[in-house]
Each structure stands twice: as structure tokens, then as C-alpha cells.
Amino acid sequence: MVLALMVQAQDATKILDQSASTLKSAGNVKIGFTLEVEGGSSDGYIKLQGQKFVLNMGGTITWFDGKTMWTLVKANEEVNVTTPSEEAVAKMNPYSFLSFYKKGYTASMGTGTAKAHEVVLTGNEGAPFKKVVIRVNKSTHYPTSIRMTSAKDAETYIRCNSLLKNQKYKPSTFQFNKKSYPDVEVVDLR
């Protein structure tokens, strides 16, 4: 029984390793997705370049250049500037599982489908999420959905709708540009 669980954990980790490798080798990507939480859903996209990202969803845009995070809530006409913790970045970037599954989680195989593997990550004490369920396309190795359960049992479901590989981004793509939003108040919380 213990041996079967060890093999299952190795298979789950191999699937995530392959998915992470495939996504990284895709170069800079733009992923369109639907985010579902209690009370509603929202479509958005994320542009990724290494650890840098810009996330646009539901009236909020978040830029992260690897050090500084800017979060613009359009309705408030305000952008908050922070130096986020690793956990804060993980919560904002739904594809951060590409690195965090290696520490703080126990991986196992879930119930997959004919087209997708299902990997279940169970958070160890102190992990940002209690449970993360990731579906990975068997032929492309790209993630197709991610279901995250917080320590307080709040669920977030992300479905990948599109993925564009080898995008070209300028460094400024991942930084807030005040000229683009001249009427927005900048609140520096660093």
C-alpha cells in the first residue's frame, strides 16, 4: 500500500514537472481564462514572462515585474503599489503552481478523464492552499483547469480557455504606466 502511494505521488509529480516544462518552453505566453468563485465568474487573461505577469480580470489589472506589484481597481480609480510576499504573488498568479507544488504539498493522482490527467495537491501545514486540483491535457501537457481550496474552504476555479505561445513583450508590459491612467491615484504601500 505504501509503495502504491509512493508510485502515485511520483506519477503526479512527473505530470506537473512535464506541464511546468512545457509551459516554460512555450516562451512568453498569454492565457485566456474564466475564474469562478462563490457568487460569480469573470473572464480574464494573464501574460507571463518567467516570474513576471500582468493579470487583467473583472475591472482589476495587476502588474508584477518580479519585485513590485501594482494593482489597479478601475472602479476606485486607484492603484496600490506593494512589494508582495511569495504567498501574495502565488495568490495573484494562478499559474504559480508551476513552482510551489514542489514544496509544501503532497501530490497524488485524482480521477482523470480520457483527455486529462488530474493531480491533487494536498497542502502541508502553512501551505497557501489546503488543496489544489490541477487538470493537465494528456497530449499538450498544458493545464486546463485549476481548483484551489483555501484554509477557510473558499474555492476558486480557473478554466483555461486559450493559450498563445511565444508572445513578444516589452519590459514595460509588466509595470504600471501612469501615463496610461492619468486620473488614477497612486497609493504606495511599500
Model features per residue range: what roles?
Residues D43-M92, A151, T156-Y157:
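An acidic-aromatic
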Residues V2-A9:
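Hydrophobic h-region of N-terminal signal peptides that target proteins for export
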Residues Y105, G110-R190:
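Gly/Pro-enriched, hydrophobic low-complexity segments
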Residues G27-L35, S42-I46, Q51-L55, K130:
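One face of beta-strands
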Residues A9-N28, T34-V37, G66-K130, D188-R190:
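Flexible, processing/modification-adjacent segments and terminal tails
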Residues D11-T13, Q49, S162:
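Intrinsically disordered terminal and processing segments
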Residues V2, T22-K24, I46, T62:
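Generic structural signal for beta-strand residues in well-ordered domains
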